[in-house]
């Protein structure tokens, strides 16, 4: 590989020496950095149109953050819970080419001390909190608490949340969770973080309002593998460590990593929040009875526990020889973490300061004809999976028209 690297570099230097500037040795049309959803879709579509593509990923596996690993018959979401949902039929049909989806519906449960509440806030939640039975009673209760607080112009997140849902819901279900998520007290957080809190006056625990929802039977990794079938992929290959070879290997780069890192943090670091996961296999058949349980009190250090087997149900799940159910389950505790270089960036911090910093990088990128940035980190924006697909297809259309 080193020889190959030297020969290529040697050829390039030799041509420069002969001053044959019109000849460029380009082995690929596109180098795609990152094999997550954005990178894989671009690779798949470009390959279909006859383009020569190389995908590199610093991880030892494809899939980016939607990577799932089968452990003892259970598909484990390695980088946090991923539930696909969309109201866009075109996008739903697109993703269904690559896997069959089950009818999983996201209905998380929030645990505050030993009390359990349905999320998002709905009539089941209000009945458990106050014993109210009708939507009218629930509305009156919330309005009464909002009026008692008397907050006209919220100065921070705490005041904003209380002005939206009252003190009881805030204290039990919002405060601790949010403080853990952001690593700051709610009184120190800006009010704009919570623009609204979804409140439903119906008995419905479905978290999303979208028409289509589910999880691919057999996990997400197969989707990416099918997209990248027949395409050259190099794993455990860090773009920055192999930059000299990689940056002159293709006509154009599709970069799905952090835009600030690509430009050497020229204007300074963008801020992110990171996560830390602790996964364990337990000798019980069913640990918590739900895929996702949020822990809303501040004293519990993790924000949620995921029990992976509940994302997919059915005869094949966790079965062992003889058709018996495996007396095992796999859980993951999710801890929010301060991001520093070297840690995985999961959430972008789209406040005023970071938005303005990103616009400087975006300006640089717009003038750079060699590279296109895509995905959460490339575009410095929180995208749900369906929005990533929309962005990737839009990018392909623009690029290959």
Q: Which residue ranges define each predicted feature?
A:
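Extreme N-terminal leader/targeting segments of oxidoreductases
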Residues: 4-30, 48-49
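N-terminal Rossmann-like FAD-binding beta1-loop-alpha1 element of flavoenzymes
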Residues: 30-55
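Mid-domain catalytic core of redox enzymes
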Residues: 12, 49, 239-364
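Short, well-ordered alpha-helix to beta-strand connector turns
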Residues: 28, 50, 231, 249-251, ...
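Dinucleotide-binding Rossmann-like beta1-alpha1 core, especially the glycine-rich loop
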Residues: 72-147
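Active-site/ligand-binding neighborhood in enzyme catalytic cores
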Residues: 113-117, 123-252, 256, 261-263
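C-terminal catalytic lobe of FAD-dependent flavoproteins
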Residues: 344-401
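Glycine-rich FAD pyrophosphate-binding loop
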Residues: 47-71
């Amino acid at each position: 590989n080193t020889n190959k690297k030297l020969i290529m570099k040697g050829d390039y230097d030799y041509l420069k020496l002969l001053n044959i500037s019109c000849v460029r040795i380009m082995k690929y049309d596109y180098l795609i950095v990152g094999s997550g959803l954005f990178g894989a879709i671009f690779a798949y579509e470009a390959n279909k149109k006859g383009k020569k593509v190389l995908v590199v990923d610093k991880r030892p596996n494809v899939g980016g953050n939607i990577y799932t690993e089968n452990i003892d018959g259970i598909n484990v979401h390695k980088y946090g819970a991923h539930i696909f949902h969309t109201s866009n039929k075109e996008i739903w049909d697109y993703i269904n080419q690559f896997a069959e989806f089950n009818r999983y519906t996201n209905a998380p449960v929030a645990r505050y001390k030993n009390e359990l509440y349905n999320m998002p806030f709905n009539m089941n939640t209000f009945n458990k909190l106050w014993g109210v039975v009708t939507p009218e009673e629930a509305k009156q209760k919330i309005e009464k608490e909002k009026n008692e607080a008397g907050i006209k112009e919220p100065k921070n997140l705490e005041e904003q949340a209380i002005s939206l849902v009252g003190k009881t819901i805030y204290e039990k279900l919002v405060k601790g969770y949010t403080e853990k998520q952001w690593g700051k007290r709610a009184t120190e957080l800006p009010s704009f973080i919570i623009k609204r809190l979804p409140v439903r006056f119906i008995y419905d625990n479905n978290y999303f309002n979208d028409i289509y929802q589910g999880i691919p039977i057999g996990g997400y990794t197969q989707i990416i593998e099918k997209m990248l079938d027949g395409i050259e992929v190099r794993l455990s290959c860090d773009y920055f460590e192999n930059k000299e070879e990689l940056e002159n290997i293709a006509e154009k780069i599709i970069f799905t990593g952090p835009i600030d890192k690509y430009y050497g943090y020229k204007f300074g670091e963008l801020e992110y929040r990171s996560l830390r996961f602790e996964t364990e296999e337990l000798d019980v058949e069913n640990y918590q009875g739900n895929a996702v349980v949020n822990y809303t009190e501040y004293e519990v250090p993790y924000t949620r526990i995921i029990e992976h087997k509940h994302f997919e149900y059915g005869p094949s799940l966790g079965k062992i020889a003889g058709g018996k159910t495996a007396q095992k389950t796999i859980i993951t505790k999710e801890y929010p973490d301060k991001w520093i270089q070297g840690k995985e960036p999961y959430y972008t911090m789209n406040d005023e300061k970071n938005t303005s910093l990103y616009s400087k990088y975006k300006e640089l990128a717009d003038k750079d004809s060699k590279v296109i940035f895509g995905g959460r980190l490339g575009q410095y924006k929180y995208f749900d999976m369906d929005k990533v697909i929309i962005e990737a297809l839009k990018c392909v259309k623009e690029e290959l028209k």
